[in-house]
Amino acid sequence: TLASLNEYLAKNVHALYFPCHPGDEGAQVGGMCIENAGGVRAVKHGIMRSYIKGMKVCLPNGDIVQLGGKLMKNNMGYDLLHLLIGSEGTLAVVLEATLKLYPRLEYTGALVCSFNTTEDAVKSVGEVQKAGIIPLAVEYMDRAISVGTAEHIERTWPMKDEGKVDLLYLVEEATEDALYETAGTIAEICENNGAVGSVIAEDSKQQRNLLDIR
């Protein structure tokens, strides 16, 4: 499962991690490959296709074949590996997968920016990326749903009176100073594009509060 993969990496290969997260850590890695899973972190690192270097699969006739692998470049013939990715199990069953990992950045943070209109929120996403900032994730949050969900699970959504819709940003950096600088820049860009307020989750408890509501 994705949970067991993440647990193994955290204990044994701490410098690297697997960013893809479809929303459920109970997901099977083989299923993620064959479904071409995505998730909110696709903003920075792409969907599952971006991570898969190779797969060993079982074809409908029982043949077991290896497609791709650890090579950085392989342009021999048809790219059957990417034909299978996203085929939803109709062409083969995944037995093994060779995955691309990324350097683990020690500091992660969450930022909520509030807007009066959906148009301002959507425009801000593009402006942040134009500034060269690629967040780990960014998600549009309907205020009524966010507040209602928070009340249902006995949590508190940080924005209630400011604006009508929110953007939830997740960012990661190598240092704490860089994290706050990035979050501050995002907040400033959003404010220049119609944001009426912003809140940075200061610690892991506040971040977990936002993610649980999300």
Protein language model features and the residues they cover:
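C-terminal substrate-recognition/cap domain of FAD-linked oxidoreductases
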Residues: 102-103, 112-117, 122-214
